[in-house]
Amino acid sequence: MTTRMIILNGGSSAGKSGIVRCLQSVLPEPWLAFGVDSLIEAMPLKMQSAEGGIEFDADGGVSIGPEFRALEGAWAEGVVAMARAGARIIIDDVFLGGAAAQERWRSFVGDLDVLWVGVRCDGAVAEGRETARGDRVAGMAAKQAYVVHEGVEYDVEVDTTHKESIECAWAIAAHVVP
């Protein structure tokens, strides 16, 4: 089967966004990219502090409420509909719930051919990137570095601790079925 979607999972500052841009460059066909960060940015600001939305704790923790979950589900269904209509889709996500988050995605994608990719990065390295970026809550990268991978099954895993995004993209691209 032809790969219709590539779903990358990794903690904050693991290097997913850079890999996505490199994948778009190295893959011969056009691939659309969507990330959980852009979903959050598309939501009204009140969703970023409301009890039912998404909350970023001072220690780097993230709490997800039912209103956020509902909108996230609608977003995922829309993205999957584009893949079913013929678009090739790359998803940049953070599976805060580990295996449960992957199962939610599985329920949306159904029988689509998906390449599941784990993007790992040492917690201390991710934390250093987080500090350099300056646009994340301190502690988020360290908290997410390992927990997002718990119980998740991948077709491909890459580690950005010592590898550049382009190297990781080439490794992932080798598993994409045209």
Swiss-Prot record:
Q: Which InterPro entries match?
A: CPT, P-loop_NTPase
The enzyme's main class, written as a single word, is transferase
- Which Pfam families would you find in this protein's record? CPT
**GO biological process assignments:** response to antibiotic
Q: In which residues is ATP bound?
A: 10-17
EC number(s)? Answer: 2.7.1.-
Q: Name one GO molecular function term.
A: ATP binding
What is the protein's known function? Answer: Inactivates chloramphenicol by catalyzing the transfer of the gamma-phosphate of ATP to the antibiotic's C-3' hydroxyl group.
Q: What is this protein called?
A: Chloramphenicol 3-O phosphotransferase
In its UniProt entry, the species of origin is given as: Streptomyces venezuelae (strain ATCC 10712 / CBS 650.69 / DSM 40230 / JCM 4526 / NBRC 13096 / PD 04745)
